[in-house]
Amino acid sequence: MKLTPKELDKLMLHYAGELAKKRKERGIKLNYVEAVALISAHVMEEARAGKKSAAELMQEGRTLLKPDDVMDGVASMIHEVGIEAMFPDGTKLVTVHTPIESKGKLVPGELFLKNEDITINEGKQAISVKVKNVGDRPVQIGSHFHFFEVNRCLDFDREKAFGKRLDIASGTAVRFEPGEEKSVELIDIGGNRRIFGFNALVDRQADNESKKIALHRAKERGFHGAKSDDNYVKTIKE
């Protein structure tokens, strides 16, 4: 007997559903996987029998499990269950919406927020830097990018931006259109201040020595706004 991958998946789902059914009968509360398997296996079997329509199984799927049949939080995790089931007239997608009524006790990942504003980067001193995009393409900078190493076509005082990032909310960004000039607020990068990656201008601890090296590299590589001391002589291993 040879089975296709899809047939093997259905067979595995049947086994999982039967196991979940036995555990339910023994009074064991089902977890997320077991709950989905039980509902899916039941729908597949009833569809194969051919005595009920897809619409009837969509409704019946909502009656198989009660909140007390599953672990706390499981009901709120299952918004819908979709099963491709074989009916006498062909394969149909049966979607069971909200298959388990939620008691509203515990919702995994639920956030309880205070009814007040959140001050980002509180206690960090910010500096203002004027930046101009001298390139011909838009440039977008993320919140935690080392601002010293941003696109070479952004012209600003890079020395002031060493070891700093944008003073904006995490995950947001600032966009500079071609020819656009505007001021941005920068704050110190937190943590142990070991800066690696980005445009590989630092790749070490952010201190005064590494700033001189980084400025030298930036000037050599054509980053606008990078001014290096011509009298500063040091061997730099690239």
From Swiss-Prot:
HAMAP family: Urease_beta (MF_01954), Urease_beta_gamma (MF_01955)
EC main group: hydrolase
GO molecular function, one term: urease activity
Lineage per the UniProt record: Bacteria, Pseudomonadati, Campylobacterota, Epsilonproteobacteria, Campylobacterales
Protein name: Urease subunit alpha
Positions of the UniProt region annotated as Urease beta: 103-238
Subunit structure: Heterohexamer of 3 UreA (alpha) and 3 UreB (beta) subunits.
Gene: ureA
CDD domains: Urease_beta (cd00407), Urease_gamma (cd00390)
Region of interest (Urease gamma), ranges: 1-102
Metal-binding found in the keyword field: no
